[in-house]
Every structure is written in structure tokens, then in C-alpha cells.
Amino acid sequence: MFRGANAISLDAKGRLAMPSRYRDELVSRCAGQLIVTIDAVDPCLTVYPLPEWELIEAKLRELPSLREETRRLQRLLIGNAVDLELDGNGRFLIPPRLREYAKLDKRAMLVGQLNKFQLWDEDAWNAMAEADLAAIKQPGGLPDELRDLIL
């Protein structure tokens, strides 16, 4: 399980180091093989361990292919998916096209989302986190079924 928000740096080539607290789990679960693609909802990238991504692909394959919404989602997620592998130093390279999409420069946030990560530009993450906190504090900011989850 991946949790927590981690400030990380991208080097001039677009490489970033996976925080050490996740490396062993990623090596044991998927031999360091990852998939990165755009996030279909948020202005960030999503990084999946390969087995998790294969589950997503299986679900996408089962959707009705004649629906425009299905094809649109498949184009966005599968069409932008890139295979990555952690190198010996725990680094991986984000392709330029995906860095541009997420507006990644030197400072980023790798955010654990249980079975995957989101990769955000640091400023965009901070703005989103503030907006999310403000939204849930508003009356009606959380649906009733989610209120029961808050401890």
C-alpha cells in the first residue's frame, strides 16, 4: 500500500528517484516495472505498478467499444501509457510529453494512493490540497456515505 505525499526532485533529464520507503515493495511486487499515464481527472500523472495497470487494462478491454466515452477513456489512458523500470538507483524517467502534460519541472510531489501514485507539480499539488480542504469543510462538502469514513 502506498500512502503519503513525498516531495521529490526531477533532474535535467526528467528522472526522479522513487522514495526508498516504496522501493523494496515495488521490486518485490513487480520487479520495479511501472506504467505511467495521464490522470483522466486531475492535472497530474498516475504511476501504477505493472500488475495494477494490467487490472486496469482488463477492465478497459471489457467496456463496450462502440461507446464514444469508452474510446475516449481508452485513448487517454492507454494511448498515453508508458512502460518504466526502476534503475539500480531507484530512479525512473518521465518522458517529455508526459512531463509537459503535468507541467513537471524540478519540484514534484509523489502522492501514494493505496495501489498507485499520483505525480504532481509541487505548486499544483499544494493548490489542489488547499482547495480540497476548503471544499470538504463547506456544508454538503462530503456526501453522507463519506461522512461515516471520517475518524
From Swiss-Prot:
InterPro entries: MraZ, MraZ_C, MraZ_dom, MraZ_N, MraZ_sf, SpoVT-AbrB_dom, SpoVT-AbrB_sf. GO terms for molecular function: DNA-binding transcription factor activity; transcription cis-regulatory region binding. Residues 5-52, 81-124 form the SpoVT-AbrB domain. It is found in: Cytoplasm, Nucleoid. Keywords: Cytoplasm, DNA-binding, Repeat, Transcription, Transcription regulation. The keyword tRNA processing does not apply. One of its GO terms (biological process) is negative regulation of DNA-templated transcription initiation. GO terms for cellular component: cytoplasm; nucleoid. Belongs to the MraZ family. Forms oligomers. This is Transcriptional regulator MraZ. It comes from Pseudomonas aeruginosa (strain ATCC 15692 / DSM 22644 / CIP 104116 / JCM 14847 / LMG 12228 / 1C / PRS 101 / PAO1).
